[in-house]
């Protein structure tokens, strides 16, 4: 399996990193774009969040198409179209065009993350899926950090060739998605039997290992699993987690700017929580695997996030507030690694695609609700204290729902 991991996971991690850059770069653009096109905090929040509404609407259809046409073609299509639309964000001139482009971008990206999660089930036996998921999810906080380091310098191109700096930012940061989409189209393979870098006996063994658990469930049992109350709880856990995550991440540059930092300082300071989270999430996942335990790690991660956001809101604009946000970020990303390692998504065929997409799509509604709540509760467009308290409440609610899930013995094991 080491050969499979080294062949697939670096590319998947890079794809996911670029995806996360694309999702958060609008928060850095907002430092100057909001003024240039006349957006207040509430209007920006609506535009930043509407991305997730279209993501939600198109996610399940996108994942079902992926199951039919294959990962190579469909993931490449997703990356190329989101790259084109992300670059087109440079053309927005006001609230209406900003909303339209953000909606189209969400529709283009729909199915990407659950598609990768589903792809893992095509290549990795059950005993390897948790670590495989953790390894490529590690790139999520790094994508946020890289976005800050790249975006703010690009904002300084203001006036070059008659364009605003944020316009250059959107154009430049669309290129990696376009290029990677072409790479995926050329090198990614859908199933083990299609590759030449595995020996014949290795291909046959791997196909047996990944197909056995898929065939162990009847279609009726699979659909029943998707619709039961435990699946609903998973969706709500991910929803409330994402409300806290995106409510903070899509406003972090504005929060830091409101604390008196220059744009250059914001670009550096905004990377700190995400670099910290990347390291912390790896340690958290390692400890979870060491203990062979998931639920308490998920609960503890969300309680840590709730505490960090509460302390940050209480402290206001200070260095210690950034430290508290960093603690919260560790919990938010650690939760995701453990959450996606739970086994109920290991179904087969179209049911597997629908199950993964349904939980992720419902969860991604939090990407709309969280930022919108933070935006409309901002006092004077610069004081986000109320929003941080509310996001802390979302994290605490996610922990409570996770405890209920554990009591229901969702995984029926010591996971």
Q: What residue ranges belong to the model's regions?
A:
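Glycine-rich segments within core transmembrane alpha-helices of 12-TM secondary carriers
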Residues: 131-152, 176-177, 360-370
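Cytoplasmic helix-loop-helix junction between adjacent transmembrane helices
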Residues: 101-138
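Helix-breaking motifs and short loop linkers at transmembrane-helix boundaries and internal kinks
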Residues: 38, 70, 91-97, 108, ...
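Extracytoplasmic gate region of multi-pass secondary transporters
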Residues: 26-27, 226-281, 336, 340
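C-terminal transmembrane helical hairpin of 12-TM major facilitator-type secondary transporters
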Residues: 292-342
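Cytoplasmic membrane-interface "Motif A"-like loop-to-helix N-cap segments
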Residues: 67-79, 289-302
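Extracytoplasmic
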Residues: 7-41, 147, 248-253, 370
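Conserved MFS/SLC helix-loop-helix module at the cytosolic interface between two early adjacent transmembrane helices
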Residues: 57-96
């Amino acid at each position: 399996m080491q050969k499979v991991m080294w062949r697939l996971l670096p590319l998947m991690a890079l794809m996911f990193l670029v995806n996360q850059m694309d999702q958060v770069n609008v928060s850095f653009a907002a430092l100057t774009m909001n003024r240039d096109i006349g957006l207040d905090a509430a209007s920006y929040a609506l535009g930043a969040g509407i991305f997730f509404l279209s993501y939600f609407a198109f996610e399940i259809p996108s994942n079902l198409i992926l199951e039919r046409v294959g990962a190579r073609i469909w993931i490449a299509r997703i990356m190329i179209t989101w790259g084109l639309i992300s670059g087109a964000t440079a053309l927005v001139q006001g609230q209406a065009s900003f909303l339209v482009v953000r909606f189209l971008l969400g529709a283009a990206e729909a199915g990407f993350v659950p598609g990768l999660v589903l792809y893992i089930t095509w290549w990795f036996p059950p005993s390897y899926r948790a670590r495989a998921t953790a390894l490529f999810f590690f790139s999520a906080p790094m994508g946020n950090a890289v976005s800050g380091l790249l975006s703010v310098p690009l904002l300084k191109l203001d006036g070059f060739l008659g364009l605003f700096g944020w316009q250059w930012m959107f154009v430049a940061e669309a290129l990696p998605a376009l290029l990677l989409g072409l790479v995926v189209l050329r090198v990614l393979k859908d199933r083990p039997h299609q590759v030449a870098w595995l020996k014949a006996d290795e291909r046959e063994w791997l196909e047996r290992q990944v197909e056995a658990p898929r065939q162990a469930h009847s279609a009726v049992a699979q659909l029943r699993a998707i619709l039961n109350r435990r699946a609903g709880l998973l969706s709500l856990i991910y929803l409330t987690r994402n409300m806290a995550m995106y409510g903070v991440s899509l406003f972090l540059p504005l929060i830091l700017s409101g604390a008196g930092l220059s744009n250059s300082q914001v670009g550096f300071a905004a990377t700190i929580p995400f670099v910290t989270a990347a390291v912390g999430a790896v340690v958290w996942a390692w400890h979870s695997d060491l203990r062979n335990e998931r639920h308490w790690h998920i609960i503890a991660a969300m309680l840590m996030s709730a505490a960090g956001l509460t302390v940050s809101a209480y402290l206001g604009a200070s260095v210690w507030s950034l430290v508290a946000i960093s603690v919260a970020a560790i919990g938010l990303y650690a939760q995701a690694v453990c959450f996606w390692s739970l086994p109920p998504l290991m179904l087969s065929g179209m049911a597997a695609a629908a199950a993964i997409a349904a939980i992720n799509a419902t969860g991604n509604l939090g990407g709309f609700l969280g930022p919108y709540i933070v935006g409309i509760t901002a006092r004077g467009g610069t004081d986000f204290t109320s929003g941080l308290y509310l996001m802390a409440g979302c994290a605490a609610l996610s922990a409570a729902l996770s405890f209920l899930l554990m009591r229901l013995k969702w995984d029926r094991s010591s996971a």
